[in-house]
Every structure is written in C-alpha cells, then in structure tokens.
Amino acid sequence: MLFAPVSKAEPSPMEQSYEGNPIVVINLTYEAGIGCGDDIRGDIVIELFLNWAPITVSNFVGLVNESFYDGIFFHRVIDDFVMQAGDPTCTAIGVYPASDPSCGSNGSDETIPFEADANLTHINGAVGMARGLDPDSASSQFYICDGSQHGLDNGNRSQEDDPGYAVFGVVREGMDLVQAAAQVPTSNDPLNRPLYEVHINSITLNGDVTPEIEETEEEETPSIGFSLSILSIGFVALLRRN
C-alpha cells in the first residue's frame, strides 16, 4: 500500500484541473425497456490524476489503450451512491441478469497496490478503484460516485485494517449522465444489477489538460488559465467485486 501526505503548496486536483493530467471519455448508452425510464446517451469526461495516483492511472490508461472496457456495461448501480463497471465478462445484450450470474466478480489479470493521497477524496463525481478485502486486489473494476461518499475515504473506515478506496480521477463533464444512469431500475437483490444495461460503448483517451490563452478587453497581453481541452492525440485504473 502506498500513502502520500497532504501537500499545502497547491490546491487539491479534485477542485482544480492541472496541466498534463490525462483526459478520458466514456461514451455510454442506456436503452430503457418498458417502464424502465428514459433512454440515456452521451459522453462522460474524466480527468485522471497522474501525479497523485501514478500506478492506478497508468493501469487504467493501459487498459483503455487496449480497449479493455469497450462493450461492457455497469453491472452495479446504486442511486445516491455509485455506479460500478470493469468486469470484462459483463457484455451480454438484453435483459440482465439473465446472462452469466458471475458477471461482476471478474477483472483483468493483474492487480495493483493500493494508493492513497490525502488530496484525493470521494466528492461527487469522484472515480475510484473497486477491490476485494485485500487493499492491493484492485485490477480493472472502477466506480463513479453519485454524490459525496466520504465514508469510502482513507481514514474514514470503521475497521483499522481497512484503508478505504483509491480515488484516481473525477468527472469534469457529464455528471447529468451519471445521475441519470444511477437512477435506472435495478434487480431486487444485493447486487443492484440494472434490469437493462448501462452500456459502455467505449472509453477513449483524448489528450490531456492544456493551458488556455484568454484575451481580455483591459489588457493586450494574454492571461493564462487552465481548462479541459479534449484533443485528438494519443497519451504516450463497500466496493467489492460482487
């Protein structure tokens, strides 16, 4: 397990974008069945915290570059908590869970050590790694917070040997899609499986955070601000697996 102290020299990346952080885009769709809400489609833009969670981000980016997540769906959805994905066996199309009942228990072949940085917390839209009882058992499953979930933070767990869950990114655009997807009807069992899939069409790496030049009326010289710039360039991962 790897831990990093709070840095007083700079604001938390949860609150401010930093130049060089990778940007990924989740393109998702939800085709609602009768009585199961409205269709959902669009992009969720996520900033990854490379300097604060380097092992976790590198693992996630590597899987994205392999198209690991393309074609799977969010197998666990809980309104006002999280939506979780990353099991490569969760690919069935149609009513779920009529497919493989083991969906939600699997991941990639390699696990990574737990990383914690006190600057990274479970605010609304935080992206973290799901894992088993072993803090170093995370592989490919991840979740997106629907609302603040600080009970998952390092230091806020009830058991002394539970370090919490590793945050490695945050949603910068598309929280309306997260909130809509978190409200889809689910099965009446502890697995909270959507009756119809919230489908990940693709997760793609779309450049990184770059400085933006802003012209002002008062000054002829430009000022430098930071914004999310999605570029078409290559950059060159309670929650337990069910």
Labelled PLM ranges:
Residues 2-218:
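Cyclophilin-like peptidyl-prolyl cis-trans isomerases
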Residues 1-11, 215-242:
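Secretory targeting signatures
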